[in-house]
């Protein structure tokens, strides 16, 4: 019975130690702090939709120079690659044969005309029959037609430019024999001012644009609804602005695209037929576009765009987005974000949906662009 006080003391000591240990653990566990995130407040802004489409230049008018009579070329009267005017003489074909033919036609006309006039007097005197007079008059008419034909052939020995423009390389030299109806053109003239640019656009993009315009989601771009800018192969911007001319009704079955034709002034002949270019088309204006910084848009396992926003209770929400294209460093959002939403762009790795957070203005993105800045950046937008 003497060991009971010792056991009691030992138990008391252990209990006291356990109690003190629990108190220390409670004191060592601080309260969890809300993570800090940087947000951007979404604001709607006017945005001109643009599409950059590949295309090629083509001459406004093209004419092949061909001979209309047979003969030997005596002279070439132009410089290859020069500008020629409509009606300017380009070649001289040997006219000797046609001059002789013309002289013969004139003589024949004099003879048949004289005979017809004599028969007309004689028929009144009944010295010749009506049939003889009719035959003589018909020969006179044939002689007049032969004379006109000879004059035309002689005129065709001077080969003239059918249109104004830049003439290319001559396929024939002095001394070469050319003939009416030959397959090879003597030269080709191309009118380069103005000049066409043929670009392609998918039918899906055209249909979407038309639906948006009909529903009122997009407004026509005012007087610039059909304006087109041109980017050259070296990346520079062509200084002249063009206008949209028409859209082909037929769809290319192999590519599923339609061809748009734009017309550009080309006074300096900077653009030449066959050049590869990109046309920037101003398709319409979205007066309340939602632009989200790319830092705040991520992809889920399926590749769909998502975003995290902070609600009124300062808790994180997950949003599924529908993004159509990029504009500089922003995404154009069609669904999933609304004006006033606070989009998280900083601290995404520290939060998840449902977590309460502390909010501050993001420092890793630029402030939303004003109207002038937005218009300056529109040229960088490309359809995905």
Swiss-Prot record:
Entry GO CC: plasma membrane
Top-level taxon of origin: Bacteria
Membrane topology (UniProt): Lipid-anchor
Residues with a covalently attached lipid (N-palmitoyl cysteine): 23
Any one Gene Ontology BP term: response to antibiotic
Lipid attachment locations (S-diacylglycerol cysteine): 23
Residue ranges, annotated region (Disordered): 362-384
Coiled coil: 115-155
Ranges that cross the membrane: none
Record keywords: Antibiotic resistance, Cell inner membrane, Cell membrane, Coiled coil, Lipoprotein, Membrane, Palmitate, Signal, Transport
Cellular compartment(s): Cell inner membrane
Compositional bias (Low complexity): 368-378
Signal peptide start-end: 1-22
Family from the record: Belongs to the membrane fusion protein (MFP) (TC 8.A.1) family.
PANTHER family the UniProt entry points to: ACRA/E-RELATED COMPONENT OF DRUG EFFLUX TRANSPORTER, MULTIDRUG EFFLUX PUMP SUBUNIT ACRA-RELATED
Task performed by this protein: The periplasmic linker protein component of a constitutive organic solvent efflux system. Involved in export of toluene, styrene, m-xylene, propylbenzene and ethylbenzene. Also exports AMP and the antibiotics carbenicillin, nalidixic acid, chloramphenicol and tetracycline.
Protein name: Toluene efflux pump periplasmic linker protein TtgA
Organism: Pseudomonas putida (strain DOT-T1E)
Lineage of the species this protein comes from: Bacteria, Pseudomonadati, Pseudomonadota, Gammaproteobacteria, Pseudomonadales
Gene name linked to the record: ttgA
